[in-house]
Amino acid sequence: MLTKVTAVCLLALGLSRPVFSQTNPDIQKVLDRLDTLEAENRKLLDEIHELRNELIERNTEGLDVQENRTAELDQSKVGTSQKLPITLTGMLLFNAFDNGKHSGTAQDPTSAALNAAPAFSGASLRQTVLGLKFNGPDLPGGGKASGQFYMDFFAGTSSPLNNLLRIRIATVDLNWKNFTLTLGQDKPIISPREPTSLAQVGVSPLTGAGNLWDWAPQVRLQQRFSFGENTGLLAQAGVYQTAESYPGTQPVEYSGTLERVRPGYQGRFEFFHGSENRRIEIAPGFHFSTTHVARQSVPSQIVSLDWLFRPTSVFEFTGEFFHGQNVAGLGARQGFDILPSEMVVPVHSQGEWAQISVFAAARLSFHAYAGEQHDRASDVAPGGVTRNFVYAGNLMYKLAPNVVAAFEASQARTQYLGSLLRLNNHYDLALAYLF
């Protein structure tokens, strides 16, 4: 900023000769204007200093508040320094349903009951799912820990005041670039897929009709191989704990001899090609274990094949096929039969299911699926099921990004040995709030 003396000197040097002829009053006017400008500049500087001090005070107050808030959060945490970040997820699901006379009084029958009962309708929230997801710390070798834990209220009874919490799926994944070790509870390794439904969530859709679904403890290894940018192989192997069940058609005196859980050994090899919108996956698999009952060993042997075919983003075809013997330990129907000679024989079974999905719009999708399990009649005791066939169709509409309405109609057609075919219709209207 120029002082008055400096300004006058510069003015004198820069003026031409005619200027010097100006009167003293003219020079005085210039000096007065310079005084005014200097005063205004000082005023501006004072205002700038005041604003700067104000900002410093505000920042200090903000930091104090943030530090106090951080201290409060630290006090509210109990040992969280060793825990993993947790995310709450799940689905609040309301179902209104209507059943036929052969539902067996179940909300979501998986087969048609042998004996008729009064048809009934109702509503329920017991298929609501609560979940926790976490992404954890780094592991040696560039790995990462993650996991999931899902529960529902399908245990207990259908009474609204007796819907008990239970574990559905719970896994811990130790992931590296091309390798994953998983420990927890999940579907069988050989049967990762299932139909899309909001009507049947408490148990997997098509249970006992081609879908091996039983959530059970297991340890699995997965190795990933890449053959190109969008082509590769997922090789999986592990130990799966079977849930052995005693058929109601068998002699009661042998029920106490059944070993309820057994180790099963499974493998699956998924070949894939394509991107998210256009993709094909096909995966053969195997399972073998042994059931101990009536002081005898009954082999369980299964071969499987599952697939996904998505030629465009609006169409999808998925499914599964299995063939083997003594498949009950994976959530299927009867596994063995005890003959009058006290010899135990495995029930030979074949099952399959398939689903077609059409994503008509961003909010609207249609799903049609069907499946069956066929047990060899010569292996089944009188009164047992030889064939259970279920087909269904549903439409789903997103009322909002996280609110889904759905309507589904299905029919179960169950054939009992020595009896007529039984039919049961099921209708379901669902509203799901996803979080």
Can you say where each PLM-predicted feature lies in the sequence?
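Outer membrane beta-barrel
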Residues: 74-245, 261-266, 270-276, 308-323, ...
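Transmembrane beta-strand segments that form the barrel wall of outer-membrane beta-barrel proteins
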Residues: 144-155, 237-241, 282-292, 365-378, ...
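Outer-membrane beta-barrel proteins
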Residues: 99-103, 158-160, 192-195, 244-248, ...
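Detector for outer-membrane/organellar transmembrane beta-barrel domains
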Residues: 267-385
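Bacterial N-terminal signal peptides
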Residues: 4-17
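N-terminal periplasmic/intermembrane-space "pro-region" immediately following the signal or transit peptide
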Residues: 21-105
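Outer-membrane beta-barrel "beta-signal"
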Residues: 397-399, 422-435
